[in-house]
Amino acid sequence: MTAPRASGYFRIRYDDDIALVRTRTQRVWLGVLALALAGFPFLANSVLLDLANQVLLVSIGAVALMLLTGFAGQISLGHAGLLAVGAFTTGILFKELAAPFWITLPASAVAGALVGLVFGLPSLRLRGLYLAVSTLALHFMVLHAGQEYETRRGLSSGVVIDPPSLFGFALQDGRAWYVVLLAASTATVLLSLNLLRTKTGRSWRAIHGREAVAEAMGIHVPVAKLSAFIVSCTLTSAAGCLAAYYRGFVSAEAFPLFVTIQYVATVIIGGIGSLLGALLGTLFVVLFPQAIEASMNALGLTDRLSSMIFAINQAAFGVAMILFLVFEPQGLVGIWRRIQAWFLLWPFGQKPLGRP
């Protein structure tokens, strides 16, 4: 005898069907989350605030990559280069023109959109590994241009950027940055959620499945691909601008290839094709190295292995990626969905917690 499963379609209005928050339970949990996020900066110390700000910064780029790879199915290995586009656009405008924040941020976004248009063109002819290699070229080209600028201007330690001012308030402490980055991250998620429900977002999902079928349905595949690259690159470049201001300097050495790998891991570990997966993957990628270092401190191994901490973090990071690819290809969001299904079916069935 099989366990009964939840069934039925309980929405009776179109407004209910298109609502972002569809149930009372979701409203309650979102309210709790909003209260927790609002109260966090008043309870956290400077270290926790810095970690939270890093999570918010990375989440913008992770959502952008999820739109491109997770929904549109276009592989990109140039994410660190896109961050560098936004950061160097900000640094050059500040250094050469003393441009304020309200100019450098949109300028960085426009620069990212132009780069996305140019480097999205190969996606019209290339797929898979070949497309990945073409986007990897973006990384090295941008970093080379950044290094040339630093060399010609004699900036051996990078471009130093003063803290920006927003509505008359200088962003000099972690709490002020937390508010700005939380607003930016929330806006990115809401924009992405609504974009995925438009004609453009549905075309991305279609070309991810099978391009020939999408084209037969009347979808202009080249336009869909280019729009995915442009939107993703715009958001990522804007995140690079915010990262440059938050760190207070811009340098080509701050964007190694490992940053791209971290963002790809965010998508894989979080779960392909889910914005929630991008956010869960961001938490994992940012907090996992901290957990490794805390474990080493607890075991008293920090002094002995101090010179190997970075290598240990990278090795543990690689092992985690392999384990997720082999044993949990749906990522953290897959685990979360099975937990939800378990509570939905309880006490009649607990099968969803096992392997599907």
Where are these regions (language model features)?
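Transmembrane alpha-helices and adjacent helix-loop boundaries
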Residues: 2-356
